[in-house]
Amino acid sequence: GDIYAGYWEEGKKSGHGNFSYINGSYFFGNFENGLANGWGFSITKDNYVTLCEYAFGDTKQCTNPETGEEFSVLENRFEAHSEIDRKNIQEKLTDIGFYQEDIDGLWGRDSFAALLKYASLEFESIALHEPLFANQILSSLLGLNLRNKN
């Protein structure tokens, strides 16, 4: 079934949390009194992303961050790295199960979705539009030593 991982308060979802749905989609956001509140994002199993603002369970506004300016900082920071570093980032995201495409060092929907998942689970934030946070996410991935290379 669906799996919720996050904080609870008095038996209700509260604070940061994420759902992994049985259909392969994913949701990360903030909860208050058991309801989505603040910004959150959904990712389909095909890595299509929707970013929405919620007010106690009601959707206020949604955007496609691939076409908006909200996350261009992350794309720019990713592309500022060398091709080797970009491939290394994708390789690390593959190792932890967030990236399943070719490791080509190119920015795209799949790299974006994988970085959102990583940021939400490891840092409990999706503030990837902030330059310092975008750098922190990419640097942390470059610092991971996951593969046993012989």
For each of these PLM feature ranges, what is it?
Residues 3-14, 26-37, 49-65:
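Conserved anchor residues at repeat-unit boundaries in beta-strand-based tandem repeats, strongest
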Residues 3, 13-15, 72-73, 129:
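N-terminal start-of-chain detector that recognizes signal peptides
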